[in-house]
C-alpha cells in the first residue's frame, strides 16, 4: 500500500534528523524528504517504511538494515538501545555499580555502534569495558564470564546480508553469560521506548570507559585450545579454512596452532574482515554457493576437511570429501555435525565416570533439531533436554555438557562460553578427526559408525514463503483446529501444541506431530522471515547402514510431500 504525505510524518523525520550524529544517515533522510515533498511516491513509501514502526528489541536484541529511521539500524537507534539497557542494569543491580563488556565484529559501523554504547553506558553510570578490537562473538560471550561483569553487548548481524547490523545482549551473574530470555527483553524494550521519547543528543556521554586487556582473548584461546583432548598426532588431518569475510581467522588461527593442528589452507579471498562480503551474496555457510570458493580451494589442495566459520564465528560448517558431488566435497548438515560432536561429548563423559557408573551431565538441542542426540543420551545414560529454538535456551539446560542447533550452532565448552561457538566447535571436530585418523578412519566413516550404532537419522527442512503474514496464522490455526490423522500413508499418533507450553518447554508457537513409524514433523513460523518452517525427521535401525539410510531418507521425502500437500492453498 502506498503511503500518504502528512505533516506528522515529516515532523517525525525532522525530529530524527535533528538528533542523528551520523552525517551519512542525516543526508540520506534529508534527500528522501526533498524527493517525497517533490512528489516521489517511492521516496514517500521509503519514509513510511522507516518511520511507521521501529525495530523491535527482543531476545535476539536488534537486527536490521543500516539506514536512517527507527525501523533501521543506525546510531540513533543504537544510542536508544544502549541508554535503555543501561537503565535496566541500574534498576536491577543493588549495592554495586553494574558493569558491561562490549564487543564488535567487522561489519559496517560495528565499531561506531560499540563506541557509542561504551560512551553512553559510562555516561549513565555503568562501568563499561570495550574489547580492544573487532573480535568473534564467542570471545565476547567468554568475556562476560571471564571478567565477571553484569552484562555483555555484541554488535553483529552474524551471517545476515552485507548491509545489516545488529545488537545482541547477554547477562552475567546467575545467567552465566547467556543471551537474554523473556521477560527480560520486554523490560529492556520498555526502557528503550522511554529513552526514545527524548533526543539522544541530550543523553550523557563519557569517555571514561575501559579497554579490555589483551589477556581476555588469550585466555579464550587457551580455554578453547584445551577442547582438543586426543593423544593422537594432531597434525595428521589437513583442512581448508574460511572466515567468510568475517572476524574468525585471527583468533581461530591461534587456537588451531596452540591445539597442535596442521596449518590450514586458507581461503585467501575470504580470510580478512570485509564489510562488503565481495565473494558471497549472503555470508551464510548454509546458503547455496556460499562455500563454492572453499570447495575450490580444498580441491586444489586435496585436503581432508573444509572448516568454515560465519562472519562473527559463532557458527561452524564442515565439509568432507565426496566424489559423487560435483564440487568434490559435501557440506554436512548441522544435525550430522551435532550428532558426531554429541557422541564425542558422551564418550568423554563416560571416560570420566568411575567404576561403570552413569556419566554426569546433559545433552541438549532445540526441539527442531534431530532426535539423534536423544539416542546418544539414552545409550550413555545421560540426561537429555530439548529446548525452544535459540541458544538462549540451549545454553541454560541444567548440567549441560554439549548442546546444538541444526542451524550450524554448537556449544562444546559450557564451562567457558554459554553460547554457540564456531571456533571451539571447529576445535572439537578437528580433535575428533585426528583421533579417527590415528585409526585409519575419517569423519565420513564415523557417520556410518553412528548409523550402525544408533540408527540412521534423516532430516529435511521445507519452508513456505508468504507475502501476507496472515497466511501463516491461517495455516497454523487450520492445523490446530483440524489436525491430520495421517501424513501420506503414515498415521499420526500425537500432536503436541507448544503454544501454552509443554512439559518443561515454555510457550511457543510450535506444533510437534509424532507418527507411528517414529518419525516427527515440527511446524513453526520463522522468527525473522515471512515463512512457515517445517522440520522433518525420520530414522531407521533395521538392516545395513545403506538400507537404514534408504529407509529413513524415503520416509523424510514422503513426509515432506505430505506436508506440502497439507499446507498448500
Stretches with model-predicted labels:
Residues 3-4, 10-117, 210-236, 247, ...:
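An N-terminal, well-structured beta->alpha segment
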Residues 170, 175-201, 336-361, 365-373, ...:
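Glycine-rich phosphate-binding loop plus the immediately following alpha-helix
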Residues 101-164, 255-318:
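N-terminal small/polar loop signature for handling phosphorylated ligands or for N-terminal nucleophile
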Residues 113-121, 163-172, 252, 314-337, ...:
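Short Gly/Thr/Asp-enriched flexible loops that form oxyanion-binding sites at enzyme active sites
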Amino acid at each position: 500500500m502506498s503511503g500518504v504525505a502528512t505533516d506528522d510524518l515529516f515532523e517525525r523525520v525532522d525530529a530524527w534528523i535533528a538528533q542523528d550524529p551520523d552525517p551519512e544517515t542525516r543526508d540520506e533522510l534529508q534527500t528522501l524528504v526533498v524527493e517525497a515533498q517533490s512528489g516521489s511516491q517511492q521516496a514517500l513509501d521509503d519514509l513510511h517504511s522507516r518511520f511507521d514502526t521501529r525495530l523491535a528489541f527482543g531476545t535476539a536484541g536488534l537486527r536490521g538494515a543500516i539506514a536512517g529511521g527507527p525501523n533501521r539500524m543506525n546510531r540513533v537507534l543504537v544510542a536508544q538501545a544502549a541508554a535503555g539497557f543501561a537503565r535496566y542494569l541500574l534498576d536491577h543491580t543493588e549495592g554495586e555499580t553494574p558493569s558491561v563488556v562490549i564487543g564488535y565484529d567487522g561489519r559496517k559501523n560495528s565499531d561506531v555502534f560499540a563506541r557509542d554504547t561504551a560512551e553512553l553506558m559510562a555516561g549513565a553510570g555503568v562501568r563499561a569495558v570495550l574489547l580492544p578490537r573487532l573480535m568473534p562473538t564467542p570471545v565476547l560471550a567468554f568475556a562476560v564470564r571471564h571478567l565477571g561483569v553484569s552484562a555483555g553487548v555484541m554488535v553483529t548481524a552474524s551471517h545476515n546480508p552485507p548491509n545489516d547490523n545488529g545488537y545482541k545482549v547477554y547477562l552475567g551473574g546467575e545467567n552465566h553469560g547467556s543471551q537474554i530470555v523473556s521477560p527480560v527483553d520486554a523490560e529492556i524494550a520498555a526502557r528503550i521506548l522511554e529513552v526514545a521519547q527524548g533526543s539522544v543528543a541530550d543523553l550523557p556521554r563519557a569517555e571514561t570507559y575501559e579497554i579490555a586487556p589483551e589477556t581476555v582473548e588469550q585466555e579464550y584461546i587457551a580455554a578453547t585450545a584445551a577442547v582438543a583432548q586426543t593423544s593422537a598426532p594432531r597434525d595428521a588431518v589437513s583442512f581448508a579454512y574460511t572466515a567468510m569475510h568475517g572476524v574468525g581467522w585471527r583468533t581461530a588461527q591461534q587456537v588451531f596452532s596452540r591445539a597442535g593442528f596442521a596449518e590450514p589452507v586458507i581461503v585467501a579471498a575470504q580470510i580478512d574482515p570485509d564489510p562488503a562480503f565481495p565473494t558471497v551474496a549472503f555470508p551464510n555457510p548454509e546458503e547455496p554457493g556460499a562455500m563454492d570458493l572453499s570447495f575450490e580451494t580444498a580441491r586444489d589442495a586435496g585436503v581432508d576437511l573444509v572448516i568454515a566459520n560465519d562472519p562473527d564465528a559463532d557458527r561452524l560448517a564442515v565439509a568432507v570429501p565426496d566424489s559423487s558431488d560435483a564440487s568434490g566435497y559435501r557440506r554436512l548438515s548441522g544435525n550430522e555435525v551435532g550428532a558426531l560432536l554429541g557422541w564425542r561429548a558422551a564418550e568423554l563423559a563416560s571416560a570420566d565416570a568411575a567404576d561403570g557408573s552413569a556419566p554426569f551431565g546433559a545433552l541438549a538441542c532445540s526441539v527442531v533439531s534431530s532426535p539423534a542426540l536423544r539416542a546418544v543420551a539414552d545409550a550413555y545414560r545421560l540426561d537429555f533436554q530439548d529446548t525452544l529454538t535459540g541458544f538462549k535456551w540451549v545454553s541454560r539446560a541444567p548440567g549441560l555438557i554439549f548442546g546444538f542447533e541444526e542451524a550450524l550452532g554448537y556449544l562444546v565448552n559450557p564451562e567457558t562460553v554459554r553460547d554457540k561457538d564456531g571456533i571451539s566447535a571447529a576445535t572439537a571436530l578437528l580433535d575428533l578427526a585426528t583421533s579417527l585418523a590415528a585409526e585409519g578412519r575419517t569423519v565420513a566413516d564415523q557417520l556410518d559408525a553412528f548409523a550402525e550404532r544408533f540408527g540412521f537419522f534423516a532430516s529435511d527442512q521445507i519452508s513456505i514463503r508468504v507475502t501476507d503474514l496472515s497466511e501463516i496464522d491461517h495455516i497454523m490455526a487450520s492445523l490446530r483446529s483440524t489436525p491430520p490423522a495421517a501424513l501420506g500413508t503414515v498415521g499420526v499418533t500425537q500432536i503436541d501444541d507448544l503454544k501454552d507450553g509443554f512439559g518443561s518447554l515454555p510457550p511457543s508457537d510450535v506444533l510437534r506431530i509424532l507418527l507411528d513409524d517414529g518419525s516427527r514433523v515440527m511446524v513453526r513460523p520463522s522468527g525473522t522471515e515471512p515463512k512457515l518452517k517445517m522440520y522433518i525427521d525420520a530414522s531407521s535401525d533395521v538392516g545395513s547402514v545403506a538400507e537404514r539410510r534408504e529407509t529413513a531418507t524415503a520416509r523424510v521425502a514422503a513426509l515432506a510431500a505430505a506436508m506440502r500437500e497439507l499446507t498448500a492453498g
